Amino acid sequence: MSIERVPILGKETIHVGYGIADHIVNEVIANLASSTYVIVTDTNMARTPQYSKLTDDFKTNLSKKRPESRLLTYCVSPGENNKNRVTKAAVEDFLLQQGCTRDTVILAVGGGVIGDMIGFVAATFMRGVRVVQVPTTLLAMVDSSVGGKTAIDTPLGKNFIGAFHQPEYVFCDVSFLETLPARQFINGMAEVVKTAAIWNEEEFTRLENFSKKFLSVVTSKKPDLQSIKAELVKTVLESVRVKAGVVSSDEKEAGLRNLLNFGHTIGHAIEAVLTPEALHGECVSIGMIKEAELSRYLGILPPVAVARLSKCLVAYGLPVSIDDKEFLKKVGPKRHYVEIDILLKKMAIDKKNDGSKIRCVLLEKIGKCYQLKAHQVSKQDLSFVLTDEVLVHPFTNPPKENIIVPPGSKSISNRALILAALGNGTVRVKNLLHSDDTKHMLDAVASLKGAEISTEDNGETIVVKGNGGNLVTCGEELYLGNAGTASRFLTTVASLVGKSPASDDVILTGNARMQERPIGPLVDALRSNGSEIEYLNKQGSLPLKISAGNGLKGGRIELAATISSQYVSSILMCAPYAKEPVTLALVGGKPISQLYIDMTCAMMKSFGIEVTKSTTEEYTYHIPKGIYKNPTEYVIESDASSATYPLAFAAMTGTSCTIPNIGSSSLQGDARFAVDVLKPMGCKVEQTATSTTVTGPPRGHLKPLPHVDMEPMTDAFLTASVVAAVAKGGSTSITGIANQRVKECNRIEAMVTELAKFGVSANELPDGIEIHGIDIKDLKTPEISDRGVCSYDDHRVAMSFSLLAGLCKEPVLILERSTTGKTWPGWWDILHSKFKIELDGYEPPFNTDKHVIKSSDKGVIVIGMRGTGKSTLSEWLASFLGFKMLDMDKYLEEKLGTDIKSLIKAKGWEHFRKEEAIVAKECFTKFSKGYVLSTGGGIVEGEDARQQLKSYADNGGIVLHLHRDLDETVTFLAADTTRPAYSSEVQEVWLRREKWYHECSNYHFYSSHCSTEDEFNHLRKSFVNYIKLITGAERSVVPTGRSTAVVLTLPDLNNVAGDLESITIGADAVELRVDLLKDTSAAFVAAQIATTRKHADLPIIYTVRTVSQGGKFPDENVDELKSLLLLGIRLGVAYIDLQLTAPNELIEEISSKKGFTRIIGTYQDINGELKWNNVEWKNKYNQGVSMNADIVRLVGRANSIQDNLDLEDFKKQNTLKPLIAFNLGTQGKLSQVLNGTFTPISHQLLPNDDGLLTIGEINQTYFDIGGFTAKKFWVIGSPIEHSRSPNLHNAGYKALNLPYQFGRFEATDVDVVYDNLINKSDFGGLAITMPLKLDIMKFATKLSDAAETIGAVNTLIPVEGGYFGDNTDWVGISNSFIRAGVPPKSSSNGLVVGAGGTSRAAIYALHQMGCTKIYLVNRTVAKLEELVKSFPKDYNLEIVETEQQADKVNKVLLAVSCIPADKPLDSDVLKKIERILSNGSEQVAGFKPTLLEASYKPRVTPIMKLAEEQYKWKVIPGVEMLVNQGDRQFKLHTGFSAPYEIIHRAVVEE
């Protein structure tokens, strides 16, 4: 048993070894005499063999060596959440109860939580007792156990209460790590890497080399630590030595010890937000990279050191970004609580700060800190490194001259790595670009055993020992991110790879964009030469599966090279390893980027293989067989594409910039940029063989370049484009850059789009772009509210626009700044430190919602049986989305010149299906965006069509399956003689197609049978609401106030369909217990949802409760449960209940496919086994938060009143997500009353096994216990004696059991209203009528958008700090239309008659409903002119002054009459109205032209009679507007949804 002793503070008290339990026991008993030894651990550790051995050995030895002493043990709950005052007090109480005294020795056996907390117990118990640290995690061994820091956490931060209390011993028994889960093991490596990074470069290098072996062992199913025992002990030992040495120099953290906090300033702040989901080491790992980037940003740390640190951390499986994919899986939605302001506040109260000044440890190089102390850093600089969005401030005073050395060329770097890996011997590669691209290349080369790779000169030099082309397969996919160069080069390299036991093939893959970029021509060429290559996803793009062991045949290879020269270079570099010499012929026209091909040939020559160009055949190359011989050293030239940015900066700002290592002799085509582009634009250019200097003209005096062919330097066109943007006086045309459409993004399109945000017009050319330059003074600042400048995950887009941004008058937001890491990770640092540009971090507002569908994004395909309403509902759908509608059957008929019935009669169903599939393929491609495609019922019969439908849905399109009751369908089809007869019964056809409809669709709507106009209108409204949800146009908002959900617990809702409206009175949602239905087939469940929607216009909570969670659905039927939950999403329910007890795979799948449906994560303790102070409830809540539930629902069972009070405490402590939490049982009713969000309620007509309360019972009880206070509401104005508002509101209060009263208060003076009503303690709110709608506004401290635009207030309610004014008249108008069957959005035209206050509300309502033009008619035109001036121009208002104008009015479908109904219509007004009504008399857009009367007396007005009887318009009486505005007013006043039918009857039934 070898034991290493490390001195600290003058004593050798740190002992490190493997399997040293005996040594620990002997050392403690022999040297720390005590009457009482106490071992404290947590419940997890207590179950391990190592702990059992330690305690057993202790007992045995103690009885022999100190029989008078005793051993006590104590276990605490595990986890950071328990490192608190409560747990500390519990340990202290135990010690006191056991009679422990000042001679007690405590052994803290566990991870950092135990070490910190029990160390603090020892520091304070009896004013300090001895403690021995026995760390059992890697993190604790190398960090928290050494140095005497002890502490507990508080709600405000970690480790804020504690003491320095040095342990008597620290025993690091590495064998304890055998029990450590892989994640915890990896977690500890962060601190190990940290100590090496700040102090010991030699150890850091060892760690770089140890990473692969370490990770393979600790992540294996049965880790064998014995195989890495020596390295593991050394890892712990070296890290402990660094920390012990620093602590010995600075025990109380006065200066030097601060260095141990490298990565912790930012890391601790992140951890404070993300704990417990994120571990300490994971957060510190991210913190180290961010603080290293800060050092680089400040010009202290070389970029290569950041890259090296990042690579090392990644090699140990640690995250280096908050947005690391695996890290995000662990922290879930908590990621979105990591906000800059929160992090800065956390950092400001860090213990190592000087007051509130934030201090960071800055790295100078690997193994050394800058000035051996922590430094004060600005919040602005921290904000910059903490976010991926940047605000570029105006270039106010840049240096007149600058010398910039860009990083190594990406093109040359990638080629050099391929050549070196294929070559024999060792080469030292200098000035290699350290970027994402080259990292992927290095990783791939190493994985394929192409070379042994190491570093020298602190990472500046890459040492490659090539294996002469002897590559072999590896077991894992080679992930290449968005590295196009790496993917193309490695595709040919992979064809040379031999087989190994690990695999028979090589798989190359990348990110989403990489899987769109073309690689087909290269694959075709390689296949023709014997390579076996398979596309695993999309034809022509990655991922690729390349069979090993085939090699290249050689001989003649033909390659299309008009898209990418990288295809050519890929084959050129690998050609010497073919079985025969290669002749590479480039076909299809002039190759793109010839200079890059020349570069490849020149580099191959440097590595010993000379390519000869054919003298007889154009664009043809001869490559001999051979093996590259690596030169001793190869220096990478700086990147000429990157050099264009600092040179362009000089051109645009009138300054001078020199690139000292790129000149006319460069291998790179982009080296010509200064001479060929900037010089003709008015710059002074001085270029030697090895350097380039550009001096720009005075700012604003650049000249446009009528035409430039940039084919030799295509990547530089983006730089040229932003320069051309401020070259006034003409246009600049850039051609020869067609290949830029298939780079990281479509760069030409991106440039046109983003330039427009600066006010610069540009247009695409067949192979280029034309930019119409403007005066620099006319540049616009892109709107931050419109997300600023998009980078498209493209480094060159980001860098180019960073130049143009600085010429704007205000700061410009650029997204995804880190994308520059592809070629110039330090670009922003150069802007900041060299060009002295002010940069700021920016954090966009977070939006968790999926992207809302727009016409420019996707389309909708509608499928379903014949007779299900596809045509009608498709029209509604197109109208709502603003799409075009295409009936594919009609399209087919037009294309073939015959109707379908005749076609089938003549040629049969089989021929028709073939033609249908051809048309489907054409339509799905040609009309994939901005269209609703209504298909024939049998579209799913063909395999090709089915695959196309599935692909469309998989790629984000909506395939909507419409269905209705089969019996109704049969009846409908029997009466329709226009369609071809089925060759079999409808039932048989349905049974055959049913599974196909489900397979091919991602959404499902059950269309109820309609027998009345009201039912038809309700179907339309339900369908539009459904479309709103599945497209994201309108998503259910989680209530913030008190809300309820009525729980439907019936086997068949059709039994109570007529009562559903009464059952749902007062509820904010309806919860359908799917598990309690008599049939859970998809058809029956869909029909039940349709019934719910037909009778209750409320969000649906879709719940399938399993037996173990108090329901009826079998727990073991996991696949059926998944199908039912996915069906709920397809049915477009607002909320889906997802049990926290479900398998993780199920939770992940539902979460990933939820679309716009919200998730309620639920756990029920049906037996009441858990008290609310049990940590398990906290764990369940955290699980709900982690799985990204929108709401967490926790249900217990109360046995006493205290259970309800404990629940209230729990709710106060857990506020990250909305929480539904209550107890069942008689004793739990109080908790149901106190619950805030979606309290489940029952009804007298429903089974109620859970003892739920009704809405009336809840409201009454809540009032009785003081939750509600009695309030008074009033209608004010004059005259109001006939106002129906009191009837409406009081009827609603009574129905919901609310303690409110609504009365009338006649007044013409608002001050009187204030004194008598508003200023009273029981004031609840006002309904305001004339003449007070304007005067009342002086009391409103805040106005709604509607009230501001309309310019009047009809509703006033008290809010914190004042009063909120709203106008619900417009809602009364719009909802009256909608309830009458008018779609909520339609691009029709509207008419408003009148010019008073209600007219303003009518205009606002019609605009909100999507009217493209609103015509105005009134007796006095001057009043209309004033009205038009008060509305924004986009309302598109037009005054109709004459009858002639009325004749020319475009078809009007919506009209609102806002003129007094008790007086005869003015004859001139009447004539104009009649002409307009006559023009809109026919039904279009799926609804009948409709007129709303704003006056509710008399019931039928003259204009209503005219419209209905003479012009056949649908009319809506004014009483409907009154009810609908009151419905919204009721919600504003009380927070409750009004019982609509009840308030309607109260108003209508006088």
Swiss-Prot record:
* Ranges where the record places region EPSP synthase: 392-837
Residues the record marks as active site: 253 (proton acceptor), 268 (proton acceptor), 1193 (schiff-base intermediate with substrate)
Query: Residues annotated as region Shikimate dehydrogenase?
Result: 1270-1550
Cofactor(s) required for function per UniProt: Zn(2+)
Q: Give Gene Ontology CC terms.
A: cytoplasm
So what does this thing catalyse? 7-phospho-2-dehydro-3-deoxy-D-arabino-heptonate = 3-dehydroquinate + phosphate; 3-dehydroquinate = 3-dehydroshikimate + H2O; shikimate + NADP(+) = 3-dehydroshikimate + NADPH + H(+); shikimate + ATP = 3-phosphoshikimate + ADP + H(+)
Q: For this UniProt entry, what is the primary localization, expressed as one broad class? A: cytoplasm
Localization (cell): Cytoplasm
Give positions of region: Shikimate kinase.
857-1047
**Family statement:** In the N-terminal section; belongs to the sugar phosphate cyclases superfamily. Dehydroquinate synthase family. In the 2nd section; belongs to the EPSP synthase family.
NCBIfam families given in the database record: aroA (TIGR01356), aroB (TIGR01357), aroD (TIGR01093), Shik-DH-AROM (TIGR01809)
Name listed for the protein in its UniProt record: Pentafunctional AROM polypeptide
Q: Which organism is it from?
A: Candida dubliniensis (strain CD36 / ATCC MYA-646 / CBS 7987 / NCPF 3949 / NRRL Y-17841)
